[in-house]
């Protein structure tokens, strides 16, 4: 399941583009997530009142949270699979407080890949997409394992 050094390089190259505007990318990812899987919006009390894409785009809180999400993910990706210290508190909060299912992590992974394809197509060809898919799958699998440690089947 692990990624090769070359695959990690592809992941981190495109992630460097994301880091140029974490809040903007994060906002787009969350909007994509909420549009394609509206049930995920119910997990965010702060955003439940946002009914249209225009309302979502105008929300400073949504943009801020998007930046928070992608900052945390970036910190995990940069560890190239050696992310135990970064993953544990994230898994604990998502399992015990937020109750975010692994299925929802799959949905946000799809949204991330979609946003990267649309914003960075030159740096996100088939090889980079496959590598990012593997990196996000590794993240989800490790989150699922941690969830079980916290007694959440997610």
UniProtKB/Swiss-Prot annotation:
Chain residues that bind nitrite: 65
Keywords, comma-separated and alphabetical: Cytoplasm, Heme, Iron, Metal-binding, Muscle protein, Oxidoreductase, Oxygen transport, Phosphoprotein, Transport
Disulphide connectivity of cysteines: none
One GO MF term: nitrite reductase activity
Compartment(s): Cytoplasm, Sarcoplasm
Origin superkingdom: Eukaryota
Entry EC no(s): 1.7.-.-, 1.11.1.-
Reactions catalysed, as given in the entry: Fe(III)-heme b-[protein] + nitric oxide + H2O = Fe(II)-heme b-[protein] + nitrite + 2 H(+); H2O2 + AH2 = A + 2 H2O
Globin domain sequence ranges: 2-148
A Pfam cross-reference name: Globin
Binding site for O2: 65
GO BP, sorted A to Z: oxygen transport; removal of superoxide radicals
GO (cellular component) term, any one: sarcoplasm
InterPro entries xref list: Globin, Globin-like_sf, Myoglobin
Annotated heme b binding sites: 94
Chain positions found as Phosphothreonine: 68
Keyword Cytoplasm attributed: yes
Modified residues (Phosphoserine): 4
First-level EC class: oxidoreductase
Oligomer and partners: Monomeric.
Function as written in the Swiss-Prot or TrEMBL entry: Monomeric heme protein which primary function is to store oxygen and facilitate its diffusion within muscle tissues. Reversibly binds oxygen through a pentacoordinated heme iron and enables its timely and efficient release as needed during periods of heightened demand. Depending on the oxidative conditions of tissues and cells, and in addition to its ability to bind oxygen, it also has a nitrite reductase activity whereby it regulates the production of bioactive nitric oxide.
Family as reported in the entry's similarity comment: Belongs to the globin family.
Annotated protein name in UniProt: Myoglobin
Species the sequence originates in: Ornithorhynchus anatinus
């Amino acid at each position: 399941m692990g990624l090769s050094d070359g695959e990690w390089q592809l992941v981190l190259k495109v992630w460097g583009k994301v880091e140029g505007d974490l809040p903007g990318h994060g906002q787009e990812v969350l909007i994509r997530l909420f549009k394609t899987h509206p049930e995920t919006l119910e997990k965010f009390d702060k955003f439940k009142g946002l009914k249209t894409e225009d309302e979502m785009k105008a929300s400073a809180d949504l943009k801020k949270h998007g930046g928070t999400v992608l900052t945390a993910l970036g910190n995990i990706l940069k560890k190239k699979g050696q992310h135990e210290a970064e993953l544990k508190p994230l898994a604990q909060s998502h399992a015990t407080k937020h109750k975010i299912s692994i299925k929802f992590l799959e949905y946000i992974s799809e949204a991330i890949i979609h946003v990267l394809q649309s914003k960075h197509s030159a740096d996100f060809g088939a090889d980079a997409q496959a590598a990012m898919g593997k990196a996000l799958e590794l993240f989800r699998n490790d989150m699922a394992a941690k969830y079980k440690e916290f007694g959440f089947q997610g």
